[in-house]
Structures are given as C-alpha cells and as structure tokens.
Amino acid sequence: MKKKILFWVLGILGVLIIGGGIYAYNVYSSVSNTLKEVHQPLKRDQNNSNVGEKVSKSEPVSILLLGADERGDDKGRSDSLMVITLNPKNNSMKTVSIPRDTYTEIVGKGKSDKINHAYAFGGVDMSVATVEKFLDVPINYYIEVNMEGFKDIVDAVGGVDVTNDLEFTQDGHHFAKGNIHLTGDQALAFTRMRKQDPRGDFGRQMRQRQVMQGVIKKGASFSSLTGYGDVLAAIQKNVKTNLTQDQMFDMQKNYKDCLKNSEDIQIPGDGHKAADGIWYYYVPDAAKQDLTNKLRSHLEVTK
C-alpha cells in the first residue's frame, strides 16, 4: 500500500468509473463534472498546447503532490511536499518527501527561506518553480490537496484504518498505539503532529502517507462508495490539479504498473537554528546533487 501515495485521488476516480456497473453513466458524468472543476493549469502552461503530451505518449513524468495547510481565509503554507517520478518504460516509481523546513531559494522572491513558504508567497505556481529549482528536475504536473478539507474526503469514505506506532495526543484527540480507526477530524490531527515525534517531520510524513493509503483502500471497494457523490463533492472542494480528465485516465491506465517497483527516498540533511533564531533543514550540496542525478536519470532527462 505504501506505493500508492499518488493514486489516492486517481484511484478513487478510476474505481468510480470502472466499477460502477449499472451506475456507470451517472458515475462517469459526475466524475467528469468534478474533474472539470478541479482542473487548474499552471500559469506557465496556459498557452502551452503540448503540456499533456508526456502522459498521452506514456513518457516518464514527475508530479508534485502538495498538501496545503489552509484555514479559513488564511492562504497557509504547504504542509506536505512530495515529488513522484513515474517511468512506464521500466515500470518504476520514486517518491521523494521534501522536509517542509528545507532551506532553499524561493523562486520569484529573490531570497532563500523554508521551502514551504513558497506556497504562502505565490501559491502552487511558486511552489512548483521552487521545487524545480531545488531538485533541478522538471515538474510536469501537480496535485494540490487542502489538508484542512481533507477530513471531508476521509469522512466521505467512512473513515480510515491505520497502524499507529507512537502514542500521543493532538488537538484534543488521543491516539493509542496499534490499529486504530480515524474519522476525518481525527485524521487531520493525526497527520499534523510532529513536535511529540522524535522523528519530527519524517514521522509526520509517514502518518500522512498512512492516511492517504487508507483512503485508497476504501476506494478499492465500490460497495464502500455507494455515496460516491459525497466523495466527489469533497474532492471538488479540496483538490486542484493541472492534470486534465483524459490525462488522469491515461495515467490510471498506463502508469499503474509503476507501483510494482517503488522506491521511497528521504533527503539527508541537518536541522538546526540559524543566526536569526529560526530552525531550518539544510541539505548538503553533494547529497542534493546525488538526488538530482537519480531523478533526472529516472525521468530520462538529458539536458
């Protein structure tokens, strides 16, 4: 299940399309309408007619999975950043979790800061540009999830089951060790905690993956999604992507086997306070170059 981080949205939509039986037409129509609403091109791509060619040609692609911590009118920051590369030629997938406190240049701001601040400064467009600059790899697509509203998606599928390896209390919810069931509100608190975890941001990233995987597990059974309208309403409200409907379906069809050969990558570095008293995560140039080389090779990028 750990391999399916990217496909939690695509998987649910795909299941609704192909598993609906006699409801197929109504489901397809509803999904189609939802995908039109969640589609939001990057500014750089609005006049680029070739933006979807990589998926249609089944070429290696990269996707930024961005969890935005938006609360009310507060634009927030990116709470979670994962870069996923898919190579359908050798059916392989690599997932890189970027610590949100990573110190790097914020493209378009003329200064360096925590990488998750790019979202607060310039939304998903600046986040994509900053991640591209940091990793020195092209980001072809993005999927943005509003983590505050993610609880609606969890509730829409009837909650999720996870295995918790650390007892803690967060936002008024207590989480015991072992197998536990989470409602939407509980899932949000479960994925936000990091200060009580000795693993810090890495521990939180692990919990975020568990919850996303739990959503996929529920989505794998159409019988559990008879209220698919609630799922689509939650997705429409809380998800944005520059993937079109056709690209999503092509990806669901042609890139699935990439999950069979998956590698999760953590970025090595050192976290400490800078002279300004702010805590940053610093990635050595050599470690970053090694990561860049690995991702560029996987994407078959030569220049």
Swiss-Prot record:
The metabolic or biological pathway listed in the UniProt record of this protein is: Cell wall biogenesis
All ranges on the Cytoplasmic side of the membrane:
1-4
User: Membrane-spanning residues where?
Assistant: 5-25
Report if keyword Nucleotide-binding is assigned: no
Tell me, in one coarse class, where this protein mainly resides. Answer: membrane
Q: Which UniProt keywords apply?
A: Cell membrane, Cell wall biogenesis/degradation, Membrane, Signal-anchor, Transferase, Transmembrane, Transmembrane helix
Q: Which cysteines are joined by disulfide bonds?
A: none
Question: Has the keyword Cell wall biogenesis/degradation been applied to this entry?
Answer: yes
Spell out which residues lie on the membrane's Extracellular side: 26-303
Enzyme nomenclature, EC number:
2.7.8.-
Q: Report the subcellular localization.
A: Cell membrane
Q: Which GO terms describe its biological process?
A: cell wall assembly
Q: InterPro entries from the entry?
A: LytR/CpsA/Psr_CW_biosynth, LytR_CpsA_psr, TagU
Membrane topology, as annotated, equals:
Single-pass type II membrane protein
Q: Name one GO molecular function term.
A: phosphotransferase activity, for other substituted phosphate groups
Biological role = May catalyze the final step in cell wall teichoic acid biosynthesis, the transfer of the anionic cell wall polymers (APs) from their lipid-linked precursor to the cell wall peptidoglycan (PG).
By sequence similarity, the record places it as follows: Belongs to the LytR/CpsA/Psr (LCP) family.
Q: What is this protein called?
A: Polyisoprenyl-teichoic acid--peptidoglycan teichoic acid transferase TagU
User: To which species is this protein native?
Assistant: Bacillus cereus (strain AH820)
